[in-house]
A protein has these predicted regions:
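Conserved GNAT-fold acetyl-CoA-binding loop/helix
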Residues: 53-73
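Generic alpha-helical scaffold signal
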Residues: 35, 46, 62-66, 81
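A short helix-loop-beta-strand connector motif used in the catalytic cores of GNAT acetyltransferases and
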Residues: 72-86
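Acyl-donor (CoA/ACP) binding surface of acyl/acetyltransferases
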Residues: 1-40, 44-51, 86-201
């Protein structure tokens, strides 16, 4: 597990670690990966490789169970709180929600996500992201969320919009995606804004 990092206003304090499990609703749970999940995670990625490759730049780095095992170990030992949750629907692994980065100095974090092709369009990602965001704002006391996606990745953009994030900007040629540059868009929301929005729903 990563070691806690002190809050900026009190270097001796320790923020809480992300929970190892988050219940979303009946049958939908988020679990931090363990080494025993490596094979199932690789199979899920491999079966959806063509589908995911359209917008995710890391597929060529995942070619074996050992690659996934190394990733799980790296996250476990990461001191900067890179963190992922496996999305399980009645036990079946269907995707991932990840804390791609956490900036403890400014109490902000970035969120990423993907879901298998057969599980897309069912609201699974939106519900899962909402649960992780609540955990980060309420339990981890973070202040600002950023989601950055490819400008033409309309399903991922729709997730950010459904979650109530605002569009803050467009970056030209932000990412090299296998054979081309792609623009990205950045969405964001702060904890106070999230609380107002949640209270209204």
């Amino acid at each position: 597990m990563p070691e806690p990092i002190g809050w900026p206003d009190d270097p001796n304090s320790q923020p809480p670690l992300p929970s190892s499990s988050l219940m979303v609703e009946d049958g939908l749970e988020l679990l931090a990966p363990i080494e025993g999940d490596a094979r199932e995670l690789f199979v899920t990625v491999d079966e959806n490789r063509k589908y995911l490759r359209e917008w995710l730049p890391w597929l060529d780095d995942v070619n074996s169970v050992d690659d996934e095992l190394a990733m799980i170990r790296r996250i476990r030992d990461d001191k900067n709180f890179n963190w992922i949750y496996l999305i399980r629907v009645y036990g079946e692994l269907v995707g991932v929600v990840s804390l791609n980065w956490v900036d403890w100095d400014n109490r902000s974090f970035g969120l990423g996500y993907w879901v298998s092709e057969s599980s897309s369009g069912r609201g699974i990602i939106t519900k899962s992201c909402r649960r992780v965001i609540e955990h980060c704002f309420v339990d981890l006391k973070l202040h600002r969320l950023v989601i950055e996606v490819a400008a033409d990745n309309h399903p991922s953009r729709a997730v950010a919009e459904r979650l109530g994030l605002r569009l803050e900007g467009i970056s030209k040629d932000r990412e090299w995606l296998y054979d081309r540059f792609t623009d990205s868009v950045m969405f964001a929301i702060t904890a106070p804004e999230w609380n107002v929005q949640s209270g209204a729903n």
